[in-house]
């Protein structure tokens, strides 16, 4: 289908007819409360959240989700199905042996992975943003056979605190990402007061 949109106010000067732009209908975006669920043995990923409004994910069990347990995506390049997340709270969840397979967006147990074709020249950030809470990940329990816990790309505002990370040997480690945290084009990131039972708190910033 083709739609014609008529604006009542002038558009920002950055928006021109020289390139394409994606439009999200904010009036159709919900707040999300996702609690007390068991997510188990899923293919590809456990859950995918994508709304600019408040999202709370708490008291869930993510058990052997195969791919990433929680994905915050963002795509106007292929799937055309997700926009930015501005206010996400992930707390008091249990994550057991995610990432037993490799699929799209499976960079860590929690992957914040918008598709940005030219990240090097991106001037702003896709997720989070000025005046927004961004993504807070706190008071969770991670049990994992591999290394990556959090992957984040193009986000302004990210907190990872008061989490417990326990290493096990249930499966052979195989993931190409050998660090706990990998951060690409991020700002206002806090990683603090976490308990890594094996002492590995490795962070890669790019």
For every predicted segment, state its role.
Residues 1-206:
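Extracellular parallel beta-helix/beta-solenoid repeat domains
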